[in-house]
Amino acid sequence: VLPEIHDRFQELRLFVREGVPAELNQDLRGAKHDLILSTQPIAEAGLEISPLFREPLKLVLPLDHRLANKEVINRTDLVGEEVLTIDEHHLYHRQVTELCQTLGATTRRDFEGTSLDTLRQMVVMGMGITFLPSLYVASEIRDSDPLRVTDVFGVNMYRDHALAWRSRSPARPLFRRLAQTIRELVPATGASDLRLLY
């Protein structure tokens, strides 16, 4: 959505930085950042938070995995499975760990990725299975990749995204317009399973 945001908000100078959500939140409160886009939860005291969308998580398996050819994967199929995740400093690690507890699976502690790209490559190499966000899947995984991407039947797996800014920021009206614009642009991202939040 960034090119379209740049076209619509030419007066806005965006500097994109990636970081751990807790650090982004702290930097926002400390006025190092004016605005953050992050997954929920975001600590709310002193911040205005505008929910954007709900993003499903997809189960990703190597093609030689025992479940790769199963038409429908159920939660019981994942009992005892070892799941790859990123290192524990990321909120995503906690989300995947909680999901694994719900499914009766475990997270692998001997191999942890440093990014979603690393997780994808680890699955391609047959090191295990993982869960990846649908936006990442839509933008980075190709039909030619030796992976099976699927849902887990009967399990609601997702993460919520929001924009946040300091509640006293003089740019509040601009940030609210920006949040609405992102909601308008999300359907064109290619991830058809996102749900808008308001």
Outline where the language-model segments fall:
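C-terminal effector-binding regulatory domain of bacterial HTH transcription factors
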Residues: 7-9, 134-145, 154-198
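Secondary-structure junction motif
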Residues: 68, 82-103, 171-180, 186-197
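Generic preference for hydrophobic
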Residues: 16, 35-37, 49, 59-60, ...
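Well-formed, non-transmembrane alpha-helical positions, independent of function
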Residues: 4, 26-27, 51, 77, ...
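Thr-Gly-centered strand-to-loop micro-motif
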Residues: 38, 62, 86-87, 109, ...
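Central regulatory/effector-binding core of bacterial HTH transcription factors
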Residues: 1-45, 106, 113
